[in-house]
């Protein structure tokens, strides 16, 4: 058996890849699967001209359904020492050595393309946090834990009384800030600030044991990101905090939801620059994006968010909002031996 790359433009091959991916997700936790729809994964894999693209890999015999599949987030413009990957074995074929065999070839794929380190992301379901097989499998294959995030879910719709209470408590702490909102496209006035916030996020956000990525962002890359989200069929709901004195954006928060499958809205990036923390900007922005979500009228049932266990301030905000633990996301890292 060999690993081979899938062309997402070939419907039959992509469907076979996605079938294994989806079965693995549902076997882990049917109620809390990651929620990526096939057209969303495909959009990320087709965008070959962008600064980043997802490579889809399958493992098995050519002409037969794959026994396992993988994703590799490939960056072109950023001098990143590692690539983030995922590996999913078909649930009916687990414990036969396919995961180990595929992992070896996945490591080779990353190393052969100039990266000295690999990161494998694993999501644990609500009923297996701390007990899932990856906790043994990864160390046995030379991996150490780079970071662990907790997933929390917030029931929707959000109680109006709680929203008003939190707003009244938090707003007085942010007198020198204005909360701005928009959907889909960043206003031109704020495009450079928005790019800067995303560029510095890897160094500003807390990670346990991962070398921060250095990312190059400008207005054009922000626009490309927004176009990709639109091609996925997702609403992009954004709040940002403007520091009145400096007239610059110092924080932002993104909430997304699929228009075709709106059961779960997902909190994507949220960042408050270190110099502006302590003013409850994270909570105020989350309330603002939830107001935008309410205006979409989509039949959402919950909002899901992931926070590094090191990010205690944002965890505290989510718990004050009423979010409850629903799973975990682990990033396993390994330094690859040179050939």
Please identify what each model-predicted range represents.
Residues 1-51, 57-59, 65, 169, ...:
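Short amphipathic alpha-helix that is part of the acyltransferase structural core
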Residues 6, 82-84, 179, 267:
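Hydrophobic residues on conserved beta-strands that form the core of alpha/beta folds
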Residues 28-54, 60, 69-79, 202-264, ...:
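A conserved beta-strand-loop-helix scaffold within acyl/acetyltransferase catalytic domains
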Residues 91-94, 119-133, 273-277, 303-315, ...:
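Conserved beta-strand-loop-alpha-helix junction that forms the acyl-donor binding cleft
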Residues 93, 97-105, 276, 280-288:
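Conserved acetyl-CoA pyrophosphate-binding loop and the N-cap/start of the following alpha-helix
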Residues 104-189, 329-334:
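Acyl-donor-binding surface of acyltransferase catalytic domains
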Residues 141-160, 266, 291-339:
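Active-site/acyl-donor-binding loops of N-acyltransferases
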